Amino acid sequence: MAEAGPQAPPPPGTPSRHEKSLGLLTTKFVSLLQEAKDGVLDLKLAADTLAVRQKRRIYDITNVLEGIGLIEKKSKNSIQWKGVGPGCNTREIADKLIELKAEIEELQQREQELDQHKVWVQQSIRNVTEDVQNSCLAYVTHEDICRCFAGDTLLAIRAPSGTSLEVPIPEGLNGQKKYQIHLKSVSGPIEVLLVNKEAWSSPPVAVPVPPPEDLLQSPSAVSTPPPLPKPALAQSQEASRPNSPQLTPTAVPGSAEVQGMAGPAAEITVSGGPGTDSKDSGELSSLPLGPTTLDTRPLQSSALLDSSSSSSSSSSSSSNSNSSSSSGPNPSTSFEPIKADPTGVLELPKELSEIFDPTRECMSSELLEELMSSEVFAPLLRLSPPPGDHDYIYNLDESEGVCDLFDVPVLNL
């Protein structure tokens, strides 16, 4: 069996394989499709124009073009070129594509410039911070901060990440607005420091929300007003006393610092108003209070009179003889006014003290129902014997209480 030798190369001038048969037919078909109106071509007309005897070859070309997304079938024997549809002109798309590519190149150049400037700035900051001569001057004094914000209240807040800060819109009465700052943290405590504390201003108070139990039990410990000097009540006492020096408050030198602490899941509220200035309160407290002259004789307490009268009979007889020998009343006799003992004030029950607490803003319906069901508003206990048939009946029913006897506006508290 003889072996087949190598195939001889085709003679020059012979067309290659891609220039004949299906490749050449595809090139002619695409050219015919581009020349069609609106890109719509009839396959029967294309087969007659290209002198194709077998329409199967035309269908092979259309299937490939449809598979790669260049054409779409409008009907059974008509196709449309997608690049020549309404608003899809080939030349317009090419021009727009060129513009978009040029814009992308320009944006890339700008991005490179910004990256270069960023590197330069970071290197400059590193050179300044790492310099030995500049490291000893890298601080800001307390006076520099206060000088930059003269006339404003500065608060330094140190809180963990995730702390929310809210400044609600002020809603004041009679044109007075009160600004508040709400800080809330669930991950750690919050520290608030007052930076520009003046020596002549009143000490600020930072109250955590909700307030602690010791603050609720002793509200007077938060802010206690200074005691006022007691004025003289009689002219005779003024003449006998030397002139007392005027009392003026002395300010403690140095900057004060306020620190408010709040644990996890707690809030701190710092409030202030434009009309409430601590300087005004300091000026009012520094005004001298002169003695007031009153031409009155206050009476002595009845308890003191009873104790003095029952002390001894000899002292009373001697006082009677002295008073009878005198021609008139003794002008040096002074009587002290009746003063209420602050320790003997009637303490309200716990339920009533919560009602008249000025720090409470509003009362919920649940609290009202709890108070109405407590012993304070329970029906009165009948101490008198049951009335007879001829007695005047004006008693309360077992289901009635103090609110039914008197007009007590419980719901308006």
Curated annotation (Swiss-Prot):
Residues 86-181 are annotated as: Dimerization. Residues 43-65 are annotated as: Leucine-zipper. Residues 1-20, 211-340 are annotated as: Disordered. A motif (DEF box) lies at residues 48-85. It is found in: Nucleus. Residues 234-249, 293-306 have a biased composition (Polar residues). Residues 307-327 have a biased composition (Low complexity). Disulfide bonds: none annotated. Keywords: Acetylation, Activator, Cell cycle, Cilium biogenesis/degradation, DNA-binding, Nucleus, Phosphoprotein, Transcription, Transcription regulation. GO terms for molecular function: DNA binding; DNA-binding transcription activator activity; DNA-binding transcription activator activity, RNA polymerase II-specific; DNA-binding transcription factor activity; DNA-binding transcription factor activity, RNA polymerase II-specific; promoter-specific chromatin binding; protein dimerization activity; protein domain specific binding. GO terms for cellular component: chromatin; cytoplasm; nucleoplasm; RNA polymerase II transcription regulator complex. A motif (HCFC1-binding-motif (HBM)) lies at residues 389-392. One of its GO terms (biological process) is regulation of cell population proliferation. Component of the DRTF1/E2F transcription factor complex. Binds cooperatively with TFDP1/Dp-1 to E2F sites. The E2F4/TFDP1 dimer interacts preferentially with pocket protein RBL1, which inhibits the E2F transactivation domain. Lower affinity interaction has been found with retinoblastoma protein RB1. Interacts with TRRAP, which probably mediates its interaction with histone acetyltransferase complexes, leading to transcription activation. Interacts with HCFC1. Belongs to the E2F/DP family. This is Transcription factor E2F4.
